[in-house]
């Protein structure tokens, strides 16, 4: 379909790759179109940590991870997914895009920093243990 629509210049399907940092730093947008059960999709967090905005379907924790830094669309909604991709493509290279990239990276530091998460879990465990 990519070839038929003459989009090969713009879209690359990479498959499995061991050098995530290099890949994430080399892409403009990460799109995750899942229709069921992703739990905590690590690749979304990895993308955002590299400053790559994400377009995700509202499955598992994807919408929580992305927050307002990217786009969240309903699962099994190809038209809405296409609209989100189109919006992102028009935004690339603008000041708004730069802010979006920075917000994605900042959200990872604020919400998913391992030391902050450990403190939060410890606090929760302490509260649960205290109630017993």
Residue ranges and their predicted role:
Residues 71-79, 88-93:
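Conserved acidic donor-binding segment of nucleotide-sugar-dependent glycosyltransferases
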Residues 8-17, 23, 72:
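Active-site donor-binding acidic/aromatic loop of nucleotide-activated sugar
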Residues 1-8:
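Short, structured helix-loop element that forms part of the nucleotide-activated donor/catalytic region
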Residues 58-72:
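Short acidic/histidine- and often glycine-rich active-site loop of Leloir-type glycosyltransferases
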Residues 31-32:
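A short hydrophobic beta-strand element within the catalytic core of glycosyltransferases
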Residues 96-127:
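A charged, aromatic-enriched C-terminal amphipathic alpha-helix characteristic of glycosyltransferases
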Residues 21, 39-49, 63-64:
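Short alpha-helical segment that forms part of, or immediately flanks, the ligand-binding pocket
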Residues 53-56:
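Short hydrophobic beta-strand element within catalytic cores of glycosyltransferases
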